Design a protein with these regions (language model features):
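Long, compositionally biased non-active-site segments enriched in small/hydrophobic residues and glycine
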Residues: 1-196
Length: 196
């Protein structure tokens, strides 16, 4: 942890320990923080004892070991993207395919936010909140933009666009957005004309 650069990464053990430690501290100091009328973060920074901080780290390490077999489990083995069905309440399943996601919840300062947690019957954490769409736009003589959606454009599990952007989303690999007719050449599956 001393060598951690405080950046998330799929291969980062420190991210795993840091997030699990933070979750543990939230549970341990929530009540006294409210009683002191300060945020949990302020309480941890100003009132938590070294013993409390270390006990929470030991508990976090134990939880990771119990759930994943080793305390030094990389974040990407824990934090996953999974889209199996179009259900609003998703049936997450550790045995089914999923994709590692390097970024964390905005709770931990991540601008690319992926709010994940374990669900009933799972040990891995699956994201259900955060950025569902990310775009950057350059304005000028011509508009230029890059974007990605979480999963894919379609809500139909039978569509090739149901999950086709999941890997790209997890990697932060934004695709070009086509605004102009010449950009659309070779990239159009079908055309729609209102009234026809």
């Amino acid at each position: 942890m001393r060598d951690w650069d405080y950046r998330w990464a799929a291969n980062s053990v420190s991210t795993s320990l840091g997030v699990f430690w933070g979750e543990e501290m939230q549970h341990r100091v929530g009540v006294p923080a409210r009683a002191a009328d300060i945020s949990i973060e302020e309480y941890v920074a100003t009132k938590a004892t070294p013993e409390q901080l270390l006990q929470a780290l030991a508990a976090a390490s134990d939880k990771i070991k119990n759930d994943f077999g080793s305390w030094n489990t990389p974040w990407g083995e824990i934090n996953r993207f999974q889209r199996l069905t179009d259900d609003i309440v998703h049936p997450f399943n550790d045995a089914a395919p999923s994709i590692p996601v390097p970024f964390t919840s905005s709770t931990w300062g991540s601008l690319a936010s992926f709010g994940a947690r374990a669900y009933p019957g799972t040990k891995k954490w699956y994201g259900t909140s955060g950025n569902s769409f990310v775009a950057v736009v350059e304005f000028g003589d011509k508009v230029r933009a890059l974007a990605v959606t979480a999963g894919g454009e379609s809500g139909d599990p039978k569509s090739k666009h149901f999950n086709d952007e999941a890997e790209r989303y997890a990697a932060g690999n934004l695709r070009e957005v086509y605004f102009y007719r010449p950009q659309l050449t070779g990239h159009t599956e079908r055309a729609y004309h209102p009234g026809n």
